[in-house]
Amino acid sequence: MSDTIPSCEACRPDAEKVDPAKLEKYLSQVPEWRLEERNGVQMISRDYKFKNFALALEFTNKVGAIAEEINHHPELVTEWGKVRVTWWSHTIKGLHELDFAMAKRCEAVFNA
């Protein structure tokens, strides 16, 4: 997986899902993230903790900005002191390399 992020390659109908044989490798690169499945669709998610709602909202907006740059958007749930970010590629109904690259970007925003 490259750290270079293309424009939403995962949004193309012919985009390939992550090879199941590579899934563990990609997950190991974002160790705080967990694999989930909803209605047969694989996703990755992580809960980020904050001291208050304002910091959680600031993080949400930063993640939203990077999503807009690429035109690839996560599910964001913002609560007092917590943000859950969930990535998957809607068009292909599963995980693409881009989802893991975007998870890495979220980590960079959180750790900045």
Swiss-Prot record:
Signal sequence segment: none
EC numbers on record = 4.2.1.96
Q: What class of enzyme is it?
A: lyase
KW Lyase (keyword) present:
yes
Claim: Lyase is one of the keywords in the record: yes
Q: Which reactions fall under this protein's catalytic activity?
A: (4aS,6R)-4a-hydroxy-L-erythro-5,6,7,8-tetrahydrobiopterin = (6R)-L-erythro-6,7-dihydrobiopterin + H2O
Query: One GO MF term, please?
Result: 4-alpha-hydroxytetrahydrobiopterin dehydratase activity
Question: Which UniProt keywords are given for this protein, alphabetically ordered?
Answer: Lyase
Which SUPFAM superfamilies is this protein grouped with? PCD-like (SSF55248)
Gene Ontology BP terms: tetrahydrobiopterin biosynthetic process
Checking InterPro entries in the record gives: PCD_sf, Pterin-4-alpha-carb_dehyd, Pterin_deHydtase
Into which family does the record put it?
Belongs to the pterin-4-alpha-carbinolamine dehydratase family.
* Protein name as annotated: Putative pterin-4-alpha-carbinolamine dehydratase
Instruction: Name the source organism.
Output: Hahella chejuensis (strain KCTC 2396)
